[in-house]
């Protein structure tokens, strides 16, 4: 597949300056036995200085200054993920990205690593609970009730959050097949949930956390929505539609389409989310709050659309108080909109942390050719198509595992989470009881994920086959548009 990065290529293509996007590169290599690459150079965009509260848990961070951050060599081994010395309740705003995660990525701050993992596990719940059995009464719905979802999916500390609403999305897809099949394709399906932190967890988190999680692409109509690669105005604000702010039409359709013609009259994904978030914000309006949106693959696109929607409508603004932070944790997410979408998100204070794998082709889509890297010629001349280029939003935390070549594994959410937690220290104490064999770390990691992905492959082979058949029914024009 032409879009997949060749693992035998040098890493140089990934080290080019991605300005104006802030890029933070974390070297990571898995091989048998483990081999570590030479230190790579990092380049970060300007951002505000980080809080001094986080100083005790940041190791080897560069000295802050008013001048642009210098180019420096990353350490050969990532930072240790040992216990943090500052409680989350004191620094949660920094962890949520108030300073664009400055000095928290390289080396990776233990608290940030912990929170990314926690939100990633909340997203994985959507996959574990999604019913794909056509013979089940809960087909395309969640297997469990809201009260038992987190416990049934064996999430750590399920009592920390209370699920308040399930979210459904309706793909607006019509292709040249039978009317009955088209009706099934337009059927709403469960894509995630809204949850609020419990009273007991508020003390540890430092605020009331409203969380929305989205799963990635699973069903055939969702695959087709991903291939509707054309930019269209979002038009979220009723009085100021901002026609220059454009997003990918397939993601927008999934976010805004409803099932109003059915006997149930289900609202769109957007209406469900805005209504529930507004209700929760009104319920906890006297408390310190945060809005955290997390998603994998297609779900990260929905999370970014929701974040922009909330901020554009001003739902997170409070009179006489500071704005409620809106943060997106994106796992393996594609590009969502154009340059104006990125600029507007930054103006509104939407924070996005993108966790990506350099070998994951999904993170290169859409806009394989025309994107933020080919918008300006020679660093000076704006190209005519720059307004139509897809652009990533936010700060990028890159996991580099070139030796993982399984196409299923490189995009798998659990692989992302596992790799994020396979951090190694610069040095290990001689007296440490953890005398593990370093040559077996990568072997165990690949073995575990390989067995898991082979099981999933056998379980879902029918769905992949159907997806391929449907994709081949697309016109050559649509396929051409997706490449660009």
UniProtKB/Swiss-Prot annotation:
Outcome of gene disruption: No visible phenotype under standard growth phenotype.
InterPro entries: AB_hydrolase_fold, Fungal_lipase-type
Chief localisation class: plastid
Catalytic reaction list: a 1,2-diacyl-3-O-[alpha-D-galactosyl-(1->6)-beta-D-galactosyl]-sn-glycerol + H2O = acyl-3-O-[alpha-D-galactosyl-(1->6)-beta-D-galactosyl]-sn-glycerol + a fatty acid + H(+); a 1,2-diacyl-3-O-(beta-D-galactosyl)-sn-glycerol + H2O = an acyl-3-O-(beta-D-galactosyl)-sn-glycerol + a fatty acid + H(+)
An MF annotation (GO) of this entry: triacylglycerol lipase activity
Cysteines paired by S-S bonds: none
Targeting presequence: 1-63
A Pfam family: Lipase_3
Top-rank taxon: Eukaryota
Induction statement: Induced by wounding. Not induced by wounding.
Active site, renumbered: 297 (acyl-ester intermediate), 360 (charge relay system), 411 (charge relay system)
Motif GXSXG: chain residues: 295-299
Compartments, record wording: Plastid, Chloroplast, Plastoglobule
SUPFAM superfamilies in the record: alpha/beta-Hydrolases
Gene Ontology BP annotations: leaf senescence; thylakoid membrane organization; triglyceride catabolic process
E.C. no: 3.1.1.-
Gene Ontology CC terms: chloroplast stroma; plastoglobule
Keywords, sorted A to Z: Chloroplast, Hydrolase, Lipid degradation, Lipid metabolism, Plastid, Transit peptide
Tissue: Ubiquitous. Highest expression in flowers and leaves.
Family to which the UniProt record says this protein belongs: Belongs to the AB hydrolase superfamily. Lipase family.
Job description of the protein: Acylhydrolase that catalyzes the hydrolysis of phosphatidylcholine at the sn-1 position. Has a strong galactolipase activity toward monogalactosyldiacylglycerol (MGDG) and digalactosyldiacylglycerol (DGDG). Low triacylglycerol (TAG) lipase activity. Plays a role in plant growth and in leaf senescence.
Protein name: Phospholipase A1-Ialpha2, chloroplastic
Lineage of origin: Eukaryota, Viridiplantae, Streptophyta, Embryophyta, Tracheophyta
């Amino acid at each position: 597949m032409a879009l997949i990065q060749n693992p035998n290529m040098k890493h140089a293509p990934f080290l080019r300056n991605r300005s104006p996007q802030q890029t933070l590169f974390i070297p990571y290599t898995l091989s048998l036995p483990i081999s570590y690459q030479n230190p790579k150079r990092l380049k970060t965009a300007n951002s505000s200085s980080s809080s001094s509260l986080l100083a005790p848990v940041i190791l080897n961070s560069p000295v802050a200054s008013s001048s642009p951050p210098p180019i420096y060599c990353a350490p050969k081994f990532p930072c240790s993920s040992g216990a943090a010395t500052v409680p989350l309740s004191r620094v949660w705003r920094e962890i949520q990205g108030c300073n664009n995660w400055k000095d928290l990525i390289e080396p990776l701050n233990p608290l940030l690593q912990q929170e990314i993992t926690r939100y990633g596990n909340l997203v994985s719940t959507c996959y574990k609970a999604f019913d794909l059995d056509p013979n089940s009464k809960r087909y395309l719905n969640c297997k469990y009730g809201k009260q038992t979802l987190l416990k049934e999916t064996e999430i750590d500390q399920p009592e920390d959050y209370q699920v308040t609403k399930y979210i459904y999305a309706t793909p607006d897809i019509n292709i040249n097949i039978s009317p009955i099949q088209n009706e099934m394709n337009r059927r709403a399906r469960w894509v995630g949930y809204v949850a609020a932190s419990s009273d007991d967890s508020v003390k540890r988190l430092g605020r009331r956390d409203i969380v929305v999680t989205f799963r990635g692409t699973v069903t055939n109509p969702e695959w087709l929505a991903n291939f509707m690669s054309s930019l269209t105005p979002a038009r979220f604000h009723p009085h100021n539609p901002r026609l220059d702010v454009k997003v990918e039409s397939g993601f927008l359709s999934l976010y805004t389409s409803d099932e109003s013609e059915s006997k149930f009259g289900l609202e769109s994904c957007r209406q469900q989310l805005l209504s529930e978030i507004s209700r929760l914000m009104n319920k906890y309006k006297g408390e310190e709050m945060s809005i955290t949106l997390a998603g994998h693959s297609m779900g990260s696109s929905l999370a970014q659309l929701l974040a922009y929607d909330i901020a554009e409508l001003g739902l997170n603004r409070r009179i006489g108080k500071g704005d409620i932070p809106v943060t997106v944790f994106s796992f393996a997410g594609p590009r969502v909109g154009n340059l104006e979408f990125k600029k507007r998100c930054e103006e509104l204070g939407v924070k996005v942390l993108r966790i990506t794998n350099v070998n994951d082709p999904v993170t290169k889509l859409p806009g394989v050719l025309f994107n933020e890297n080919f918008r300006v010629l020679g660093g000076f001349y704006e190209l005519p198509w720059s307004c139509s280029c897809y652009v990533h939003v936010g700060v990028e935390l890159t996991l580099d595992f070139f030796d993982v070549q399984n196409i299923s594994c490189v995009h798998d959410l659990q692989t992302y989470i596992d790799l994020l937690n396979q951090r190694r220290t610069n040095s290990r104490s001689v007296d440490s009881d953890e005398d593990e064999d370093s040559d077996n770390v990568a072997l165990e990691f690949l073995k575990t994920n390989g067995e898991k992905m082979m099981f999933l492959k056998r379980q879902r082979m029918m769905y992949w086959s159907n997806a391929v058949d449907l994709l081949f029914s697309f016109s050559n024009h649509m396929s051409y548009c997706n490449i660009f």
